[in-house]
């Protein structure tokens, strides 16, 4: 697969995100909303009836590799089956684009619990790299030596990303 790097990847946002219900018992929405932004990018949303944060997560695909950014606010696979959803996305993407054995990288935008609660669902997954849950592990994985001033290029199977530190409410 070829991924042009000269421009942003075009895509479509949904008309509406699920919002859950006042009570999880009355909720009829799926625990994870899956939106295909484009052929190789998915935006996931945690149902707000499961956790008020309603976390967003992202899955990016490149040749032979996928990157999951963030794992939501709920650790329980029974309530929030994120790994099941991600595994199904990978299987469907592989079938559509004649790929196999896609390696998964599990990373976080920053290290707050509402972004990595379902991390535990992936720790025993084969063919998976867990970037880490400490500032030091994250800096080492991406290769930062002058964070946050440095901008690094990351090759996700022929799909190039720029990794950079940004001001926010968490150091990594």
Residue ranges: model-predicted function:
Residues 2-27:
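N-terminal low-complexity, Pro/Thr/Ser-rich intrinsically disordered segments
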Residues 3-4, 31, 98, 143:
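Short, flexible coil/linker elements and helix-boundary hinge sites characteristic
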Residues 31-93:
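Conserved beta-strand hairpin/beta-sheet module of binuclear metal-dependent hydrolase folds
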Residues 74-163:
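Active-site HxH/HxHxD metal-binding segment of metal-dependent hydrolases
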